[in-house]
């Protein structure tokens, strides 16, 4: 924190008992799920992040070392935070974080996270240099996020909801066989599976996208691939879950 922060002895607020201060903080922090696109779209408007319609007070996090230490867990533990992982950026708290840029340390304080990503092709499917650069940027964002959430000594993550976008025609064009599908899933998800462990609650959901009326053959092909994908994701979930003592 900046050296200009007021000294704790000059703040009468800190003379209140800790439980009173915590009660006050509850009226000044978000309690609605934090979604990135609404924050990005409505920058010119007042964003309401509380059920009661009142404003939050992020200035609390800059007020004082002690207040920061008390508020930070409440601020990032009171609601669910969405993280969007794209080929060009990560979105977190309405901020666009491009590849090869460190993530904000506050992401480790998030207790409930909704992670949104879409299945991408692997580099061997790509012939365009610019598309390859985007894919490598996606891989950097993925591994950086996984690393940030891997340290059980610092992270506070207790619930992880993974929403996985699947472009069905693209998926079938990239994976003709079960082994190709598993290669594709590993490329997109292995950093999370290997590094983010011992989370109390892990869930996943497929967000399927298709276009037009599909033939029965198309539907059968996808049904077979979907069963493999669901088995992979269930195994991944079990790997990431917290293991009971003993």
Question: What are the roles of these predicted feature ranges?
Answer:
Residues 4-47, 51, 58-66:
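N-terminal Skp1-binding subsegment of the F-box domain
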Residues 16, 41, 93, 117-119, ...:
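Generic detector of low-complexity/intrinsically disordered segments
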Residues 19, 31, 152, 184, ...:
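Low-complexity, intrinsically disordered/propeptide-like segments
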Residues 50-223:
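C-terminal-biased hydrophobic
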Residues 206-246:
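A cross-taxonomic marker for long C-terminal extensions/tails that follow the last structured domain
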